[in-house]
Amino acid sequence: MVLVWLLLLLTLLAGARLLWGQWKLRNLHLPPLVPGFLHLLQPNLPIYLLGLTQRLGPIYRLRLGLQDVVVLNSKRTIEEALVRKWVDFAGRPQIPSYKLASQHCPDISLGDYSLFWKAHKKLTRSALLLGVRSSMEPRVEQLTQEFCERMRAQAGTPVTIQKEFSVLTCSIICCLTFGDKEDTLVHALHDCVQDLMKTWEHWSIQILDMVPFLRFFPSPGLRRLKQAIENRDHLVEKQLRRHKESMVAGQWRDMLDYMLQEAGRQRVEEGQGQLLEGHVHMSVVDLFIGGTETTANTLSWAVVYLLHHPEIQWRLQEELDRELGPGAAGSRVPYKDRARLPLLNATIAEVLRLRPVVPLALPHRATRPSSIFGYDIPEGTVVIPNLQGAHLDETVWEQPHEFRPDRFLAPGANPSALAFGCGARVCLGEPLARLELFVVLVQLLQAFTLLPPEGALPSLQPHPHSGINLKVQPFQVRLQPRGGRGEGPGPR
């Protein structure tokens, strides 16, 4: 009986809070509101949200749990908010699962905007650009070469390449962050990331985020999430201890060495203190959560599209043969010279346009009263950029749903996509992700022709339960080794 009364009281308080919030906004010029809650049941939410723009325009509000959120569906509105008015929208809402995932200390991806957040972001970016800059490309190339050798051992037989890509990207992050690519560590971290993301994306956690007072009630999903986070932290702490015991001052073997030594030196602005070991811990978490499955998923989508478009694969291999010589599997195009392979760059851009890393960007929060597209945006408003929607806008892109890499080959023919976000919260791992996409596809297409199993082209539709990322539906591919004449699939 007490539980029933408590639930009733919490419901009444939530309703009163919602009504009070609506009353305070009565005199503002707000974006139009989508009534009801049925949008939460849509299987492909970004596409559904884009469809609403036909009658509501590129910006509108919809109800998400106990609050209204503003959705941005065009490149123009997204860039107005996140680039031109980035300070106004650099905040992050304090969602229950975000707080739980960041229990060690605020991280970069989920942490709210502050001076500490700026210093934390600077430390992690420096680790990527300075700490391992000279060794990043050689390590990615070496690990990709080992990956191709493993694939060669399975040549001609159907391979579930999504998992292989996932292990590859995890080994790259392990090598750059910990200086270690030992199989046991790689697979432990890979399984940890898989378990954490699967648990986090479960419907029970999504409901908890939308109706926060439910956290006071028993939840098996919440228990599983706490256990997954505990496992994650155990693995990271073990590496932190190992590095502190063995690192040499003034030298760094990997990003973790660099961050541990630099954290104490980077003072936060206005004398508010300095970064702590907990910040380094969460930087490592961000690198693994944001840098493994996202890149592996993009590589998987690239393979899917090339299986559906063998004429593009043939042209890509022709481009590689022309630049490197037929069958030159040992030759490389340095990433700084990537302009030598314009079609490959265009293909990567087109895959990222159609299947952005995160279709709905993580929510932003208005740090002060502002406006977007002429509408008032009160302080504290949650704003969600629909990146995939912006990439499929028919007013910007010709035949937006078609896979056409050539659209990026004509100078100025199309605007750049927003696959990694933009503004202050653009993905820190974008340079590494783009390097990985380039190196892996170069080596893969040099070494193999990608073929579907007999009569089994993969689906172009995302997995119906994709979660944060637009996941590929399970599929297999046959990797046919290329001979010395540079054979490709041939034009269709």
UniProtKB/Swiss-Prot annotation:
Keywords noted in UniProt: Endoplasmic reticulum, Heme, Iron, Lipid-binding, Membrane, Metal-binding, Microsome, Monooxygenase, Oxidoreductase, Steroid-binding, Steroidogenesis
Residues holding progesterone: 232
Residue positions binding heme b: 92, 121, 364, 425, 427
InterPro entries: Cyt_P450, Cyt_P450_CS, Cyt_P450_E_grp-I, Cyt_P450_sf
Membrane topology (UniProt): Peripheral membrane protein
Principal EC category: oxidoreductase
Record localization: Endoplasmic reticulum membrane; Microsome membrane
Gene3D superfamilies with a match to the protein in the record: Cytochrome P450
Annotated EC: 1.14.14.16
Pfam families given in the database record: p450 (PF00067)
Reaction catalysed by this enzyme: progesterone + reduced [NADPH--hemoprotein reductase] + O2 = 21-hydroxyprogesterone + oxidized [NADPH--hemoprotein reductase] + H2O + H(+); 17alpha-hydroxyprogesterone + reduced [NADPH--hemoprotein reductase] + O2 = 11-deoxycortisol + oxidized [NADPH--hemoprotein reductase] + H2O + H(+)
Positions annotated to bind 17alpha-hydroxyprogesterone: 232
Recorded domain comment: The leucine-rich hydrophobic amino acid N-terminal region probably helps to anchor the protein to the microsomal membrane.
Protein name: Steroid 21-hydroxylase
Protein source organism: Sus scrofa (Pig)
Organism phylogeny: Eukaryota, Metazoa, Chordata, Craniata, Vertebrata
Name of the gene encoding the protein in the UniProt record: CYP21
